[in-house]
Amino acid sequence: HYEAQLPFVIYRKPKAESFFSLLQKDDKLHVNNDLSEAGFVFAPFDSNQNIVLIPDSNSLSFEIDLSQGLNVIPTDFASDKTPDLHNRADHIKLVEKGIHAIKRGDLHKVVLSRKESLEGIAWDSFMDIFTRMLSNYPTAFVYVWFHPKVGMWAGATPETLLHLDGNKIQTMSLAGTQLYKEGKI
């Protein structure tokens, strides 16, 4: 699907033994700002930007059992290089800044994450990264999302947005979630 430049998402739910794929049939950019249509939503942090949807109604979907071929995944994804002290120092400063903001009452929760931008990466390399994320983060929601008009994103998050247990729903705030204050966004 990537070679044909058609939108798709591949994801695994936390602790799941299978992963899912949703393959859009065309390259149309579907926007669904009112969340009225079923599919996989990719929403930006900026609420002024459009919510992109890979719609169920215009996609093929598959579930793949991880024991059927991806059970032997390399676990040596972590680099054995010496950590870059400059990046480590920047990270420590960022943690300290977050702690001070919490103590001042400006923030109640801070989540630091790593970001890497890769340009010109081959599809085989990206699938290798995805399979390593599956192995290294078994309790996380792991995904690769692609749209030729938006780009490719991959990630792993341990946070649960919504958990359904019978008729009981539990939720928690995710990174970036802030308390609503009248007149402030």
What residues fall within each predicted segment?
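Cytosolic ligand/metal-binding cores
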Residues: 23, 35-37, 163-185
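Secondary-structure boundary elements
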Residues: 92, 100-106, 135-137, 146-150, ...
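Sequence termini and other peripheral, non-core segments
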Residues: 1, 6, 14-18
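Non-catalytic accessory segments adjacent to catalytic cores
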Residues: 11-120, 124-125, 166
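Short, surface-exposed beta-edge/turn micro-motifs
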Residues: 5-8, 36-40, 139-141, 151
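Short, structured patches in soluble enzyme cores that scaffold and shape functional sites
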Residues: 45, 114-116, 145-149, 156-158, ...
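SIR2/sirtuin-family catalytic core signature
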Residues: 122-165
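A short, Trp-centered hydrophobic/proline-enriched beta-strand micro-motif
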Residues: 6-13, 108-110, 140-145
